[in-house]
C-alpha cells in the first residue's frame, strides 16, 4: 500500500490563521467556507482509511480461517470408503464434510465477494 500520510490534519486546517493586511484580500466568509469543506473531506478520508485498515484485518483473518478449514477438510476426507466400519459413520462424515464445504463456500463469498 502506498504512503498515505497527510501533511495537514483537519485540526491543522481548522486552526490555520492567515496574516491580515491592510490591502484588499479574499472574503473571509468564502475562505472559511472553503476550509470547512476541506476539513470535512479530510475527516471523511481519515474515517475511510480506518475502515480500510479494519476490513484488511478482517480479510486476513477470514483468509486464515478459510485455509484452516480447507486443511481440516483435506485431512478429514476419507482415503477409501472401506476404511469406515459402518454406513452411519460414513453418513456422519459425509454430512460433516458437506457442512464444512458450505462454510468454506460462504467464507469465500465473504472474502472474495463472489
From Swiss-Prot:
Its main location: cytoplasm. Gene3D superfamilies: 6.10.250.660. It comes from the Bacteria. Residues 74-99 are annotated as: Disordered. It is found in: Cytoplasm. One of its GO terms (biological process) is regulation of cell shape. Keywords: Cell cycle, Cell division, Cell shape, Coiled coil, Cytoplasm. The keyword Iron does not apply. Residues 85-97 have a biased composition (Low complexity). InterPro entries: Cell_cycle_GpsB, DivIVA_domain, DivIVA_fam. HAMAP family: GpsB. PANTHER family: CELL CYCLE PROTEIN GPSB (PTHR35794:SF1), CELL DIVISION PROTEIN DIVIVA (PTHR35794). Forms polymers through the coiled coil domains. Interacts with PBP1, MreC and EzrA. Belongs to the GpsB family. This is Cell cycle protein GpsB. The lineage of its organism: Bacteria, Bacillati, Bacillota, Bacilli, Bacillales.
